[in-house]
Amino acid sequence: IGLGIPAEPLFRSNYLLRLQQVFMRCEKLQRHVKFLYSKGGMYKIYNGNLLYHGCVPLNPDGSFKQVEICGKEYSGKALYDILEYYARRGYYAKDAKERALGQDMIWYIWAGPGSPVFGKAKMATFERYFLEDKETHIEEKNSYYKLLENEEVIGSILEEFGLDKADAHIVNGHVPVEQIHGESPIKCGGKLLIIDGGFSKAYQKKTGIAGYTLVCNSRGMRLVAHEPFESTEAAILKESDIFSDSIVVENFSRRKMVADTDTGKEIQENIFYLEELLEAYREGTIMEEV
């Protein structure tokens, strides 16, 4: 591109527009995004456990941090809910302005200082690439990460999301665990479990592992730590495999039954409505089609 050509800005604008259209019209990408919106969320409560990515923004004293979103302040669960609302408007809204606001909020969720998903004061990617001064590379983390062993704080987070702090767990993703230096993914006596811990290859020199998998069955919960995968070539030539170590998190005092799970509750609810329907037919409240 000639830097002295007057038409260059228009050329670049058209180029960016075409690039945008390629992304928006990509069938596979749209299918993936649709899947994320239909199955995903800012957090999930599953079988009495709280799953989220990043952190719950906290003040240094452990109280929930107030974050301003569109002129109003939110904290704790309400912050997650309002951010998810806007993220969904960014995809589903018919009004162009409303959809644009939602898309701006998705950007904020990714890199905003008050975002639970980001959890830092700033993103210093630019500084790390282009500035030699290491001081500019620092990304100050939210106070949450210093309070992972605080039982009162972890209990208040579980209660904020409507869970029993005596039995529930927090399953926390996107937190590197430096196992190479003896750090454990099990925090606060087993109330908080980290399941990322180095899954990304970029973190593996720092963590010494390739992440964790949480396994939960009728008898208990355990974390499986995975060794980094070297390469396909090494796996063939050396006949090596990915080795994993298990860490027992909790053994249940009694075995969990299907009825104790969210799936079991859904089955029980379906049984209830089917029995109600059957009773209505038997009593003649609903007439059979002949």
Which residues does each predicted region cover?
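Feature recognizes metal-dependent phosphohydrolase scaffolds
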Residues: I1-V290
